[in-house]
């Protein structure tokens, strides 16, 4: 390995620029035009979601309810508060997550909680005999991200999940959500929007934020982009892919800490994790009706499958080996594209 491949391999063992090129070229060709169709066809969200204040204490109460749904064992976990949500652990008996509560954005804390509990559940389910060894944790950045995004997006934004849990949310926010129906909530939590900030991006546009960063990183290594032109190229790509005019560096090239902390090659794992999640969903659905399981009282059936096929191995095998054994095939990004297109064409009433 040499050049950019060295850094890519550091964050996701076995990945190279050639492999990522195939992945991101598919995202560019398939999702850029599709996203433009979705943005033009979306219905407006219910005014309650933008007009109401959602008290932090009520949000915390619902996130505590979600701990039970996610099997986030209170004897082994804790949930605190921080400026930016994160997960930390000391083995499979001490997993800690944090959250942040914005009173003008109901969905933010809900999906941060589910996301971080997805990370945490992975660590909780690593086999006991791997604890206190070098293999006693998640196998890779992308595989870890696949677990958090699987629960956040594939499960947590599904109709089946909220058919079960929306009544609880509505009971906690009885005044704020008066007159709001399940379909209104589903449109709200799945709304796509072209935005400047990667960490605030929705499920559909998120991979384009990562695509832009990948293309810039690769360009700096192959000599097609000079460092002094990074901001200009960044702004051009946001205009090309998302139709946005970046107003300043804060909403542009300096928004992430990764490059300034030396973490070059990290960004692609975020999109790869989402793509892994889509293929895991398809594999799981071959073994049992995963959509029915999403609507159960808790995620027990789903978590048991993930433990048996992914979690229990920790990092005792290569990421690709664990993934391919779990899904029964090599990684195929078409599952991700098909998942997004199918979901958003249904939501927006458009043809693919």
Q: Where do the language-model regions lie?
A:
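Contiguous, non-catalytic segments that form substrate-binding/exosite surfaces or channel walls
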Residues: 1-106, 329
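Secondary-structure capping and boundary motifs in well-ordered enzyme cores
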Residues: 23, 55, 89, 93, ...
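All-alpha helical catalytic cores of prenyl diphosphate-utilizing isoprenoid enzymes
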Residues: 31, 56-59, 63-80, 89-91, ...
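Acidic/polar loop patches that form or flank catalytic/metal-binding clefts of enzymes
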Residues: 75, 129-133, 156-167, 227-228
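Active-site recognition of the HExxH zinc-binding catalytic motif
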Residues: 108-128, 145-149
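Active-site-proximal binding-pocket segments
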Residues: 124-125, 151, 155, 159, ...
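Post-HExxH zinc-binding segment in Zn-dependent metallohydrolases
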Residues: 137-178
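C-terminal, non-catalytic "cap/extension" segments appended to globular domains
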Residues: 210, 214-352
